[in-house]
Swiss-Prot record:
GO terms of biological process kind: translation
Protein's UniProt name: Small ribosomal subunit protein uS7
Function: One of the primary rRNA binding proteins, it binds directly to 16S rRNA where it nucleates assembly of the head domain of the 30S subunit. Is located at the subunit interface close to the decoding center, probably blocks exit of the E-site tRNA.
SUPFAM superfamilies, alphabetized: Ribosomal protein S7 (SSF47973)
The gene coding this protein: rpsG
One GO MF term: tRNA binding
Family per similarity comment: Belongs to the universal ribosomal protein uS7 family.
Pfam families to which the protein is assigned, alphabetical: Ribosomal_S7 (PF00177)
Length: 156
């Protein structure tokens, strides 16, 4: 076991516009080179645009998009007797959120609309409709876990 002291979990302050911790976390994950104001602008613009298109409140749209992208299971590599197995494990709620946000941001960055706000808005809308790259990533993760179900007894 490690003798090092575990890093304390830092609590994130809610964002100024919506007063929501999830939005603040999303902004922090989107931020590049410490430019938080730019990231905030992009996220707020994306939520506003997507909310108008879908006739939904911005926060509920983000929540729903994250809900549709959250993975329930994932695979972790486990070495047993010289062979490496992909063992399916359940994903903790905090990691579910982190993965969902990471996948949404990654999918938005790989799109080719003009502005990042536009890309993010379209990715949110596609996630709510259960299509798009982020949802595909979640399905792929679930498929991997399903395919390796036989190794579930190696869980630790």
């Amino acid at each position: 076991m490690s003798r090092r002291v575990r890093a304390p979990i830092r609590h994130i302050l809610p964002d100024p516009k919506f007063g929501n911790v999830m939005v603040a976390k999303f902004v922090n994950m989107l931020m590049v080179d410490g430019k938080k104001s730019v990231a905030e602008k992009v996220v707020y613009q994306a939520l506003e645009t997507a909310g108008k298109k879908k006739n939904m409140e911005a926060i509920s749209l983000l929540e729903e998009a994250l809900d549709k992208v959250r993975p329930a299971v994932e695979v972790k590599s486990r070495r047993v007797g010289g062979a490496t197995y992909q063992v399916p494990v359940e994903v903790r709620p905090v990691r579910q959120n982190a993965l969902a946000m990471r996948w949404l941001i990654e999918a938005a960055r790989n799109r080719n609309e003009k502005s990042m706000a536009e890309r993010l808005a379209n990715e949110f809308l596609e996630a709510v409709e259960e299509r798009g790259a982020a949802v595909k990533k979640r399905d792929e993760t679930h498929r991997m876990a399903e395919a390796n179900k036989a190794f579930a007894h190696f869980r630790w």
